[in-house]
């Protein structure tokens, strides 16, 4: 079975509707996706309804922005309701688990100031709690040195980091959905809990420069403005 458990729609900074996302997943022949928009679950219900009709499992999720100054991201899966943004990383993990969800660290160690947890912060988090999984394979550029650093970090902290996860961080529908996936056997949640998941890269992401620039505007300008307005 194949999952792409990190996908976005127009509800946050993705470039596709829920219908387009589901269609892309069916075309890519994945068995499961998770809708993980930034700080909102507005597209989840529609995607789940469309997925059910298409024979696709859609997990209710969210990519939550933690508080300043870190503003890193934590993904929650199997959520019943949105998780409030702006909390500490450890409180965000706790809020996900309080409603029975799984807490996942997305795209770690990318050398940017926000959005990607850094080694020292992740080490501090693991001093006080565990997580259910961490993306060890993703589409964002990491570089060979940081890739080795991530691999070594996972080996050293596997018991507290949970399952190895692969996800495309899909923002462009058919252009990137399924580029990086998670292979699993049986029930997805059970496979994550048992740590039997296997991250895989299936192809390169191919997104025209103009489309990528429009998405970056949505991410870096439109999304923060919506947060300031209280829309997220």
Residue ranges and their predicted role:
Residues 3-5, 9, 15-23, 42-48, ...:
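Charged catalytic cores and adjacent phosphate/nucleic-acid-binding surfaces used
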Residues 38, 63, 108:
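Short, ordered loop/turn segments at secondary-structure junctions
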Residues 99-104, 108-109, 161-163:
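Short beta-strand/loop segments at the ligand-binding rim of alpha/beta enzyme cores
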Residues 10, 22-42, 59, 101-104:
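Divalent metal-dependent hydrolysis catalytic cores, especially in the metallo-beta-lactamase
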Residues 86-91:
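Ordered, amphipathic secondary-structure segments that act as subunit-interaction surfaces
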């Amino acid at each position: 079975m194949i999952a792409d458990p990190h996908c976005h729609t127009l509800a946050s900074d993705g470039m596709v509707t829920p219908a387009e996302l589901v269609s892309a997943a069916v075309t890519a022949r994945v068995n499961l996706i998770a809708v993980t928009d930034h700080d909102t679950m507005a597209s989840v219900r529609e995607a789940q309804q469309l997925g059910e009709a298409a024979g696709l499992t859609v997990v209710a999720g969210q990519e939550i922005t933690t508080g300043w100054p870190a503003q890193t991201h934590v993904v929650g899966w199997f959520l019943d309701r949105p998780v409030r943004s702006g909390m500490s990383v450890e409180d965000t993990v706790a809020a996900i688990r309080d409603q029975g969800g799984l807490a996942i660290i997305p795209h770690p160690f990318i050398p940017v100031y926000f959005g990607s947890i850094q080694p020292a912060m992740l080490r501090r988090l693991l001093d006080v709690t565990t997580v259910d999984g961490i993306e060890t394979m993703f589409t964002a550029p990491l570089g060979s040195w940081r890739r080795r650093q991530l691999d070594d970090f996972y080996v050293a902290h596997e018991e507290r980091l949970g399952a190895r996860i692969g996800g495309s961080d899909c923002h462009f529908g058919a252009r990137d959905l399924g580029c990086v996936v998670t292979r699993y056997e049986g029930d997805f949640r059970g496979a994550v809990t048992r740590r039997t998941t296997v991250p895989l890269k299936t192809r390169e992401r191919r997104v025209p420069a103009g489309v990528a620039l429009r998405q970056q505007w949505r991410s870096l300008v439109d999304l923060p403005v919506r947060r300031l307005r209280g829309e997220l």
